[in-house]
Amino acid sequence: MKLILLILTAYLLGSIPTGLWIGQYFYNINLREHGSGNTGTTNTFRILGLKAGAATLLIDIFKGTLATLLPVLVGASNVSPIAIGFFAVLGHTFPIFAGFKGGKAVATSAGVLLGFAPLYLLFLAAVFVLTLYLFSMISLASLTASVVAVISVLTFPAAHFLLPGYDWLLTITIVVLAAIIILRHQDNMKRIKQQSENLIPWGLNLSKQQPASHH
């Protein structure tokens, strides 16, 4: 029973459509009708600006972290934190409060790792920032960090680097989260191939993307 409640709470936490609600309540803007139509951090930054984007990022990360820490907070020591965190990502991606159309799972996945393996998250964040600097694309940075996450979760424990030993639940979760993130970025990948992906005004844009101007 406790397990079902934890899963449900994590899913509902994850389901909070931060960007969508911030847009509606504070700016009177429906994010689905602007930019990429996505309700995650990137589109929130692009359409509503820095404050709203930062708030969305932090809250979306916090959703994952809080969900991951739920078993600890309620003293359910036999429940795996990472498994509960996973349901927050599921909620974030398919939110019950927003017609099951959610974000691309990046921020909330980061939040889950922050609660479970913070140093490992720091490593992936470094990969993300480096890729972002070299190519100026949030999508490519997310995809690269996801692929590196899968490779590293399979190899690091062998070297006892950042991850002490193999944790099959963490491994499965990372692989599934990476798969969700990659699947949610299909459109971005097409644009990267066509060299028309949206850029951020930072970094080197090494792959010379030339996005069409925004409508």
From Swiss-Prot:
It is an enzyme of class 2 (transferase). Pathway: Lipid metabolism; phospholipid metabolism. GO terms for biological process: phospholipid biosynthetic process. It is a multi-pass membrane protein. The keyword Cell membrane applies. SMART domains: G3P_acyltransf (SM01207). It is found in: Cell membrane. Pfam families: G3P_acyltransf. One of its GO terms (cellular component) is plasma membrane. One of its GO terms (molecular function) is acyl-phosphate glycerol-3-phosphate acyltransferase activity. HAMAP family: PlsY (MF_01043). Catalyzes the transfer of an acyl group from acyl-phosphate (acyl-PO(4)) to glycerol-3-phosphate (G3P) to form lysophosphatidic acid (LPA). This enzyme utilizes acyl-phosphate as fatty acyl donor, but not acyl-CoA or acyl-ACP. This is Glycerol-3-phosphate acyltransferase.
